[in-house]
Amino acid sequence: ICALCIQSILAQEKMFVHRSDKITQGVLLSVLDSMTFVNEAVLLHLHDQDAPTYSMTEIDSLSFGDNSLQIKILYSDTGIEIVNPLAFEGVSISVDDGNVIITSTISEEVEYILTGTISNGMFKIYSDKKFILTLNGVNITNADGPAINIQSGKKVTVNLTEGTINTLTDGKKYADSGSEDMKGCFFSEGQLIFNGEGALYVQGNKKHGICSDDYLLVNSGNITITGAASDGIHANDYIRIDGGSVTVTSDSDGLDGDEGYIEINGGKV
């Protein structure tokens, strides 16, 4: 048995475990007592937490760096790369084929940055708190569900990174989700606020293009609904456009505020 004490690494805040499955997990050095190597396994001993265990074949390397509230997800048909510095602080991420599924109980506002291209996948999240979703040149197609599926009633700020083109496409039929609501290619149970100077193209083959079960606000960005089987943009409470550009092609309403209203104060529609 060999114990490695890392408390002397005072200049850094976290140790990052780079796993062979392309997932990187961060551990706060302040809660890490030691690492133990035993029987071809690595045990991380944390204050007041169960010790996570990795087999030696699971770990590619270790590195040290600063703390961060940014989680990075790079989509690819050959494997999804994830950097999760909050793995032991309340943000759990699993990958099922091309589907990234996040459960977040952390109290801080986390930013999820999506890049890359996948031909059959999804971004799905359950979050107890509001968060930021940055689309940084991501292209997601999902054959049997939404491309983005936010099962959280909290506010989501969607940043469209300047100079990027982001494309979302859903399937004509969705897999059974039990009691979960899914009403569009980009779906959220909570409020959606769009910012940034990038472009977003959405193809809603099942129902709506973009749908919020709360309100939807566009401050900036170039949003194009290339097609929707129902409404282009749908919100239960209201839709407000203060800036940016919104272009819609749909089989039903272009914009539908459902139980609320539609307010256009600026931008181009």
Predicted regions and their residues:
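Sec/Tat signal peptide C-region and signal peptidase I cleavage site
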Residues: I6-A11
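A composition-driven surface/loop motif
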Residues: N67-V269
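Sec-dependent N-terminal signal peptides
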Residues: I1-C5
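Compositionally biased alpha-helical segments
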Residues: Q12-S68
